[in-house]
Swiss-Prot record:
The keyword Metal-binding applies. This is Uncharacterized protein in pdhA 5'region. InterPro entries: HAD-like_sf, HAD_sf. Belongs to the HAD-like hydrolase superfamily. Cof family. PANTHER family: PHOSPHATASE YKRA-RELATED, PHOSPHOSERINE PHOSPHATASE. Mg(2+) binds at residue 44. Phosphate binds at residues 21, 47. SUPFAM superfamilies: HAD-like. Pfam families: Hydrolase_3. GO terms for molecular function: magnesium ion binding; phosphatase activity. Keywords: Magnesium, Metal-binding. Its cofactor is Mg(2+). One of its GO terms (cellular component) is cytosol.
Length: 95
């Protein structure tokens, strides 16, 4: 059985039933004993919504789909403007 997740007008992810980025993160934090509140994720596509909603802090890229921005905790600059670097600075995760 499969799950289909559209993340762009012309692109769809095909995943095993129950599979998602959020599920992968859940399994990893369980294995490592990390608190979900300490987990950060960056995303820009519709396939990132579940992940951004799941983690402690979800960051949408400035170029993200509007639905992605709505579920994120905050929005950083677009990918093309070093958005991840700026987001990490905003979160005070890097100097």
């Amino acid at each position: 059985e499969f799950r289909f997740v559209r993340w762009h007008d012309v692109s769809t992810d095909v995943l095993p039933a129950g599979g998602s980025k959020a599920e992968g993160i859940r399994l990893m934090i369980e294995k490592l004993g990390i608190d979900k509140g300490d987990v950060y994720a960056f995303g820009d596509g519709l396939n990132d919504i579940e992940m951004l909603s799941f983690v402690g802090t979800g960051v949408a890229m400035g170029n993200a789909h509007e639905e992605v921005k709505r579920v994120a905790d905050f929005v950083t600059k677009p990918v093309s403007e070093e958005g991840i670097w700026h987001g990490l600075k905003q979160l005070q995760l890097i100097p």
